[in-house]
């Protein structure tokens, strides 16, 4: 497990830029132009076994004890080189040692260099046996990477592993720029551990010291090390001033932790954010525990609750053991339904509506797999809203392909549904689904014929409260058996032609597709809907055999789905254009018997569902993607979206977007506790744009703006300005995003955030602008259209 830490400890600045190629690679190359490189042949082996070569204008000595060299003195051994106006060589036989101790004193214009460092000063000393070197009142420059400084005394120790400075300074800025530096009474640079340790450290911006610490660490590479990371600060309207001081703990090669005290002025306390990562034989995972001991804002809004401990726990795990066992955890739980409205977290959002807690253990061998899982939901919309959990659920699959010309599969499921409310129906559901398929295909087409039997048994309990409610149209039954056969034939052809007349080298395909699906009607009004919802119907979704997800609602079908796709490929076999259009024609009404489903009372047949998708790569820099779905059962366009993008490179792009979802579609597809929320009563109708652009040398700007035409209000706004150099990077950003809905005042709640971040450069291999990461972090994230 590898974690890169391009950070400076406790310098009261923050990092928000991440690595990219393109412009980042160009900047890295430019920065290295100001860094010296080792240009002599690299010598390997034991340096003490290598000869010492001395060149000078004049030499005199008392052999074998000492010698004096003057005038352009140049001493070389292995990769080390010492130059000076005068060098005094001393050789002394130590008692009990086979080799004499050889030292040199250098005076005047002393210059020492090897493949790691360059030292310069008026006076120097070196031990030719141990390669220990001292240079007084000089400066140093790291070789092959950024890093330089000055010191009263500079020492090389441990076969050049350590550079030790007394009253020294360090900066990664290139020569000629001292924008920032760290000065200490002692500085030890450990090349093996890739760290610089500094005692009595003063962090300076230009000549002005702004921070003091008795001890600091500077990482000078990408190696994982325990220590404080770069702090971060920002201002938001919901928390006012916020300050982060993360500490990274490198526990072991296979596990680490990041502990972050997060001060929030408006909350009047510190939230402790604790992230733990691990890698074991059973898999890899991440745990997060965030804890706020008290929250004065929440306590003022909820005085009856008293002191409120607010927290988040997140656990993600995925792993395989002994090649057959599979373990997965996806668990998120928070202290209260307002948590994600009040606090930003990468583990959840105020727009999610719920948090999932799922555990699963699976076993898989050839032709067989089984999974036992539990799944619960924490709903944020309303504390009185009910939700179902699967406690537990067993899924089993058995495959036997190439059984003659047939492929076969048997799927089974057993699940027990429990509701968060005591008066809601609960059930045990057992489902068995054998399938036989006859696949036929060649290079120009395919025909798949499939038959299956879906047998489901329900044992429902706690029905009295539901059945006695006059508002419920359906009456539930204690025991229900439902058996439904299904037959499907799906055929596809691929025609191809050369477009030599219109576009030489280009190829066009025409791909018609026809599917017939038959499922007989079964009245399911006696079954409560525990886990079914309407599935989205894009072009590919037209050819699904299910209208609803889950098993509680399986709609009857006597329908033909037709569609056609055409694609255009260039002479390099790159897809430049495609468009797909399809429809579902119902010979008989699609029904489940559930009177709560509005359109089942309309008795509609014919062409009810249409869908189309298109993609056009106009050029290497321009791309268009669009889709629309029309459902006559909803009497409206269900969803549509379009995206036009111009991309010059990784960090220079402009994208225009349109998103639409009808209120009828939202009510049909989302759970009632979410779809009936005030902010969705008119559906979603948004236009917006995202952009990232290099506006000048090393300056870039990023922005995003989405406007909801239904409410005539912005949905999301973000603007960021970045400067990137070899020495440091700066980002100033503003964001205004939707953060919930005030039911009492009937208006949206927005959060405004202003951030100012700085990163010291040259301490690692990171030179990226990070513009796409900024765009993807939005509440409406950027997705490429290319």
UniProtKB/Swiss-Prot annotation:
Biological-process GO terms, alphabetical: Gram-negative-bacterium-type cell outer membrane assembly; lipopolysaccharide transport
Disulphide-bonded residues: 31-726, 173-727
PTM comment, free text: Contains two intramolecular disulfide bonds.
InterPro entries tied to this protein: LipoPS_assembly_LptD, LptD, LptD_C, OstA-like_N
Signal sequence coordinates: 1-24
Source domain of life: Bacteria
Main location: membrane
Keywords (A to Z) from UniProt: Cell outer membrane, Disulfide bond, Membrane, Signal
PANTHER family: LPS-ASSEMBLY PROTEIN, LPS-ASSEMBLY PROTEIN LPTD
Name of the protein in question: LPS-assembly protein LptD
Organism per entry: Salmonella choleraesuis (strain SC-B67)
């Amino acid at each position: 497990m590898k974690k890169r830490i391009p950070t400076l400890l406790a310098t009261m600045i923050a990092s928000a830029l991440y690595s990219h190629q393109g412009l980042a690679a160009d900047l890295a190359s430019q920065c290295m132009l100001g860094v010296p490189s080792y240009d002599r042949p690299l010598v390997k082996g034991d340096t003490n076994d290598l000869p010492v070569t001395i060149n000078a204008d004049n030499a005199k000595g008392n052999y074998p004890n000492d010698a004096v060299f003057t005038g352009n003195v140049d001493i070389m051994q292995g990769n080390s080189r010492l130059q000076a106006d005068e060098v005094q060589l001393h050789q002394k036989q130590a008692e009990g040692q086979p080799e004499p101790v050889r030292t040199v004193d250098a005076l005047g214009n002393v210059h020492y260099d090897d493949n790691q460092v360059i030292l310069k000063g008026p006076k120097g000393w070196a031990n030719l046996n141990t390669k220990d070197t001292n240079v007084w009142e000089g400066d140093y420059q790291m070789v092959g990477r950024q890093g330089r400084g000055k010191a009263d005394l500079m020492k090389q120790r441990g076969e050049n592993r350590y550079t030790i400075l007394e009253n020294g300074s360090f900066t990664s800025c290139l020569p000629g720029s001292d924008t920032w530096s760290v000065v200490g009474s002692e500085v030890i640079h450990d090349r093996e551990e890739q760290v610089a340790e500094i005692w009595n450290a003063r962090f300076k911006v230009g000549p002005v010291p702004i921070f003091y610490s008795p001890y600091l660490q500077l990482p000078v590479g990408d190696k994982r090390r325990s220590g404080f990371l770069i702090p971060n600060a920002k201002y938001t309207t919901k928390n006012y001033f916020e300050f982060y001081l993360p500490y990274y703990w490198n526990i072991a090669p296979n596990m680490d932790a990041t502990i972050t005290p997060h001060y929030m002025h408006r909350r009047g306390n510190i939230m402790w954010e604790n992230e733990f990562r691990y890698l074991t034989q059973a898999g890899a995972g991440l745990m997060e525990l965030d804890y706020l001991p008290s929250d004065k804002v929440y306590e003022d809004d909820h005085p009856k609750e008293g002191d409120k401990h607010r927290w988040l726990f997140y656990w993600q795990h995925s792993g395989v053991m002994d090649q057959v066992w599979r373990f997965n955890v996806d668990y998120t739980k928070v202290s209260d339904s307002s948590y994600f409205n009040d606090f930003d977290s990468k583990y959840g959002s105020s727009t999610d509506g719920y948090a999932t807690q799922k555990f699963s253990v699976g076993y898989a061998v050839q032709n067989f797999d089984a999974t036992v899982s539990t799944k619960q939901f924490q709903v944020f919309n309303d504390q009185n809203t009910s939700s179902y959990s699967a406690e537990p659920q067993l899924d089993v699959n058995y495959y036997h392909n190439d059984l003659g010309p047939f492929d076969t599969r048997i799927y089974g499921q057993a699940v027990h549904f429990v509701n968060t409310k005591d008066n809601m129906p609960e059930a045990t559901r057992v489902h068995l689904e054998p399938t036989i398929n006859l696949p036929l295909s060649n290079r120009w087409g395919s025909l798949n014929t499939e038959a299956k039997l879906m047998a489901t048994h329900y044992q429902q309990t706690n029905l009295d409260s539901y059945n006695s409610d006059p508002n419920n149209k359906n009456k539930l039954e204690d025991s229900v058996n439902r058996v439904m056969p299904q037959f499907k034939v799906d055929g596809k052809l691929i025609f191809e032609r050369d477009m030599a007349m219109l576009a030489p080298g280009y190829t066009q395909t025409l791909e018609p597709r026809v599917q017939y699906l038959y499922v007989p009607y079964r009245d399911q009004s006696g079954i409560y809907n525990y886990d079914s919802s309407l599935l989205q119907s894009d072009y590919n979704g037209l050819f699904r055999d299910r209208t609803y997800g889950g098993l509680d609602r399986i709609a009857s079908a006597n329908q033909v789905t037709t569609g056609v796709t055409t694609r255009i490929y260039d002479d390099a076999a790159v897809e430049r254009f495609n468009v797909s259009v399809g429809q579902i024609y119902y010979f008989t009404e699609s029904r489940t018997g559930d009177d709560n489903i509005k359109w089942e009372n309309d008795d509609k047949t014919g062409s009810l569902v249409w869908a189309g998708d298109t993609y056009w790569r106009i050029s290497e820099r321009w791309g268009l993607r669009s889709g629309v779905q029309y459902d006559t059962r909803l009497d409206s366009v269900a969803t549509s979206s379009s995206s036009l993008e111009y991309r010059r490179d990784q960090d220079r792009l402009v994208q225009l977007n349109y998103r639409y979802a009808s209120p009828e579609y939202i009510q049909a597809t989302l759970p009632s506790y979410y779809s009936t929320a005030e902010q969705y009563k008119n559906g979603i109708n948004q236009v917006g744009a995202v952009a990232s652009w290099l506006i000048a040398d090393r300056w870039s700007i990023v922005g995003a703006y989405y406007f909801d035409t239904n409410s005539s209000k912005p949905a999301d706004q973000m603007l960021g300005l970045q400067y990137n150099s070899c020495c440091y990077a700066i980002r100033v950003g503003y964001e205004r995003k939707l953060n919930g809905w005030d039911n009492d005042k009937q208006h949206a709640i927005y959060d405004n955030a202003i951030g100012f971040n700085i990163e010291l450069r040259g301490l690692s291999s990171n030179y990226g602008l990070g513009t796409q990461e900024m765009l993807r972090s939005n509440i409406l994230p950027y997705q490429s259209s290319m």
